[in-house]
A protein has these predicted regions:
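Structured loop/turn residues at beta-strand edges in well-structured enzyme cores
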Residues: 57, 80-83
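Intrinsic disorder
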Residues: 12, 35, 103-107
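Local sequence-structure signature of Cys/Sec-based thiol-disulfide redox active-site neighborhoods
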Residues: 17-53
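Non-catalytic, surface beta->alpha helical segment in thiol-disulfide oxidoreductase systems
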Residues: 83-84, 89-120
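Short amphipathic alpha-helix with an adjacent loop that forms part of the alpha/beta core around
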Residues: 20-22, 73-80
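Thiol-based oxidoreductase modules, predominantly thioredoxin-like and allied folds used
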Residues: 9-13, 33, 45-52, 56-73
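N-terminal leader/targeting and pre-domain segments
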Residues: 1-29, 111-120
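Eukaryotic short linear interaction motifs
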Residues: 39-40, 69-72, 97, 110-113
Length: 120
């Protein structure tokens, strides 16, 4: 376990950057894909922020704006991992592949909370 909480990562531009990020996974990585213009993203923003604040030090959190990281979003979409935004992805420590261990899409509070409870 790390002594300090890692910063929220916001710059995962493409698939190779995602795979590089997964290689340094200290225990768990949670990535939120969204956009400034996305209404459903705004609906779950405070819920996701609260969960991110409660994360232990061995969890990396990432908030990816699909407009600035469109190559990554496009890659995940072509692999049918994401359908749209918002989407939350969970990767456990030994997963070094782009396919997540858990995923939830949409702005349903119950599904978002259940996702975090499952992942932790």
């Amino acid at each position: 376990m790390y002594s300090e909480k890692p910063p929220i990562i916001t710059d995962i531009k493409h698939a190779k950057a995602l795979l590089d990020f997964l290689k340094i996974n200290p225990g768990l990585i949670i990535i939120k894909l969204g956009a400034e213009w996305c209404g459903p993203c705004k609906l779950i923003e405070s819920t996701v922020d609260e969960w991110f604040k409660k994360m232990p030090n061995n969890v990396y959190c990432s908030i990816v704006d699909i407009d600035s990281c469109f190559e990554l979003f496009g890659f995940l979409k072509t692999k049918r991992i994401v359908k749209g935004v918002p989407t939350l992805l969970c990767y456990y420590k030994d997963n070094e592949h782009y396919v997540p261990d858990d995923v939830v899409s949409g702005a349903d509070y119950n599904e978002v909370n259940a996702f975090f409870e499952r992942c932790l």
